[in-house]
Every structure is written in C-alpha cells, then in structure tokens.
UniProtKB/Swiss-Prot annotation:
NCBIfam families: nusB, PRK00202.1-1. GO terms for biological process: DNA-templated transcription termination; transcription antitermination. Gene3D superfamilies: NusB-like. The keyword Transcription applies. Belongs to the NusB family. Involved in transcription antitermination. Required for transcription of ribosomal RNA (rRNA) genes. Binds specifically to the boxA antiterminator sequence of the ribosomal RNA (rrn) operons. It comes from the Bacteria. This is Transcription antitermination protein NusB. GO terms for molecular function: RNA binding. Keywords: RNA-binding, Transcription, Transcription antitermination, Transcription regulation. It holds the Pfam family NusB. GO terms for cellular component: cytosol. InterPro entries: NusB-like_sf, NusB_fam, NusB_RsmB_TIM44.
C-alpha cells in the first residue's frame, strides 16, 4: 500500500474513532478488512497515543476557531498531519502538508483544504 493510501485509510479509521467512539483496533479492522499496513497502523496508533499533545499543538493555531467547531474529518486530518510532522522523522514536512491538502480536497472541500493548509503552515517548520 502506498503512503497516500495509508494516510487516507488512517484518516478513515481516526474519523470512525472520533465519530463512533470505536476502539482503535476495531476501527483499523473495519477499514483494513483483511489487509494489513504497518504505516497506516503506526499513524492511527500514534495519533491516539499522543492525542492530547497533538490537540495542544493544533488549538493555538486555529485563528479564531475552536476545536469543537471543526468537522470531524478536518480535525482527524489535522491530527494525522501534526503526528507526521512532529513525531515521524522520515516524512518531510512539505510532503505531509501537501498530502493533507490533497486528502482534504477528497474528503472535505476546497475551503477546508485552505484552512488545513493555513493551520499546518503555522505548525510545520519548512526545514524538516
């Protein structure tokens, strides 16, 4: 599975966890069916293990927004991206940012992709 697909599947799992208060294992199982992808699982597990810290990074960068006003898709995608940016050294920040914008265009809308771009641009140093 390519990393883009792993990110999309991770977003879907995080969305299920957020929306349905589903367990991490059940969400991964629902999304992956009989497949397995280590990177996808690493993303979901990493976001959930560091959720409070990730939210603390996101919240001050929302510019007149509150986290409880964000759509579940946008919030899940921001968490996923912040995890990649701050916790994984093998993904350049620019790649994570661009992937998030493209995934937002698929699962959310143009307005959300611009919003996500703005939030992540404040969070992600460009030199990694």
């Amino acid at each position: 599975m390519k990393r883009r697909e792993a990110r999309e599947k991770a977003l879907q799992a995080l969305f299920q966890i957020e929306l349905n208060e589903m367990s991490l294992d059940q969400a991964i199982k629902n999304i992956m069916e009989d497949e397995q992808d280590d990177y996808m699982e690493k993303l979901v597990e990493g976001v959930m293990a560091n959720k409070a810290e990730i939210d603390a990074i996101i919240e001050p960068n929302l510019d007149n927004w509150r986290m409880d006003r964000l759509s579940k898709v946008d919030l899940s995608l921001l968490r996923l991206s912040v995890y990649e940016i701050n916790y994984l050294d093998d993904v350049p920040n620019r790649v994570s940012l661009n992937e998030s914008i493209e995934i937002a265009k698929i699962y959310s809308d143009e307005k959300s992709s611009k919003f996500i771009n703005g939030v992540l641009a404040n969070i992600a140093p460009e030199d990694k």
